[in-house]
Amino acid sequence: MFKTLTQNLTKIFDRLVNSGILTENQIDTAMRDVRVALLESDVALPVIKGFIAEVKQKALGQEVIKSVSPGQMIIKIIHEEMINLLASSESTTKLNLNSKPPVNLLMVGLQGGGKTTASGKLALLLKNQNKKVLLVSLDTYRPAAQEQLAIIANSVNIDSLPIVQGEQPLDIVKRAISEAKIFAYDVVIYDTAGRIQIDNVMMEEALAIKKILNPTETLLVIDSMTGQDAVVTARSFSDKLEISGLILSRIDGDTKGGAALSVKYLTQKPIKFLSCGEKLTDLEEFDAERLASRILDMGDIISFVKKAASIVDREEAERTAIKLKSGKFDLNDYLKHMRSIKKMGGFGSILSMLPGSGKIIDQIDQSKLDSRIIEHQEAIILSMTLKERKNPDIINASRRKRIAAGAGMTVQKVNILLKQYKQISAVMKKASKMNPQNLFRSGISKLFS
């Protein structure tokens, strides 16, 4: 979501690095450029003023001016200040479950902000930490809202409180408290009703619910795609409801990203999670340093490795590596590789985590990042015989025509798949000999150009 900001900052950094020793005037110019980049990304003005002042104060210090590489030093200062802008203490960033079970978590936010989906994602994350979780919908206003949460819960085998038609929110809360004790749940997540806009009735109801539950966390789900409106929403909820933390939803959207840089600073409430995709597994624990590195085009290799480790079987990866080195990487292996990429969020998600991607993102054919391409390629490979998958070189024109018909695709798409298979085979052979940034620039990027 930080594409524009990342590209603008990267251009500024390139000029800084290439300037050699920097004068005060050059630093002033760079700070003006950074200010414009932040404004264009919808970062709130008070945040920009504070950020620029801190960076400039440190950049004008003697230790920077006399540095061997002053441009790199200023980039380091900007990185550190962005971390400070986003970060909270570890004790407040971590989800607070320190209470006698069942622990109550209250989810609040505006309608359409991703609150219900975020509730499901958080429930799944806790389930994967061996917690017994109950999901409770308190939204009796939006049609089928309770059913939506029940469907989400059922899809990941998590319990949800049975729906009683006509029951009011406070009565649902009391029934949920009783059920949670009887069935010994560790955590109960309450999804409150959202509104199209903030109003007193909404706040009064949320306050009454909070008073009964005494939750360890009151989490505000903010839609990152709403720009400056997200900041207004966050401030209103923070002032009236005493929220304990923030979940930023739709962080993967094609937006300016300013909200993510503004809400924590202006509310002084910690960002706890990033909701970064449509799947219920797409919830990341917030890490200021990693997000700052991603924004500044330094990549997020830690997130990349964590995501890969949770999806890719280690033994299978080792077998694939051996096949690559021996030149025996076939279309069965390619299919497994594509399925792993799909589970990790697709090509776009992976590229965003690699260092240096911001500099060449405009050179990439965006249509080739479409997640449907993997689905099409899967259909094509499954239309091949086992012999063809093991020996792609035997796939001649007549075989390609038959495979295309069986998959419901064009022959051109079969040709593209076979070409990409050869390219990936070649690129992956180089992987062990190159660092991630050079690999991206010289190899992987060619697949999408």
From Swiss-Prot:
Enzyme Commission code: 3.6.5.4
EC class of the enzyme, as a word: hydrolase
Sorted UniProt keywords: Cytoplasm, GTP-binding, Hydrolase, Nucleotide-binding, Ribonucleoprotein, RNA-binding, Signal recognition particle
Binding-site residues, GTP: 109-116, 191-195, 249-252
Name this polypeptide is given: Signal recognition particle protein
GO MF annotations in UniProt: 7S RNA binding; ATP hydrolysis activity; GTP binding; GTPase activity
Quaternary structure note: Part of the signal recognition particle protein translocation system, which is composed of SRP and FtsY. SRP is a ribonucleoprotein composed of Ffh and a 4.5S RNA molecule.
Function per UniProt: Involved in targeting and insertion of nascent membrane proteins into the cytoplasmic membrane. Binds to the hydrophobic signal sequence of the ribosome-nascent chain (RNC) as it emerges from the ribosomes. The SRP-RNC complex is then targeted to the cytoplasmic membrane where it interacts with the SRP receptor FtsY. Interaction with FtsY leads to the transfer of the RNC complex to the Sec translocase for insertion into the membrane, the hydrolysis of GTP by both Ffh and FtsY, and the dissociation of the SRP-FtsY complex into the individual components.
Family, per entry: Belongs to the GTP-binding SRP family. SRP54 subfamily.
CDD domains registered for this protein in UniProt: SRP_G
Pfam families xref list: SRP54 (PF00448), SRP54_N (PF02881), SRP_SPB (PF02978)
GO cellular component, one term: signal recognition particle
Domain of life: Bacteria
Localization of this protein: Cytoplasm
Listed InterPro entries: AAA+_ATPase (IPR003593), P-loop_NTPase (IPR027417), Signal_recog_part_SRP54_M_sf (IPR036891), Signal_recog_particl_SRP54_hlx (IPR013822), Signal_recog_particle_SRP54_M (IPR004125), SRP (IPR004780), SRP54 (IPR022941), SRP54_GTPase_dom (IPR000897)
Domain description: Composed of three domains: the N-terminal N domain, which is responsible for interactions with the ribosome, the central G domain, which binds GTP, and the C-terminal M domain, which binds the RNA and the signal sequence of the RNC.
Gene Ontology annotations of biological process type: SRP-dependent cotranslational protein targeting to membrane
Catalytic activity of the protein: GTP + H2O = GDP + phosphate + H(+)
PROSITE patterns reported in the protein's UniProt record: SRP54
HAMAP family according to UniProt: SRP54
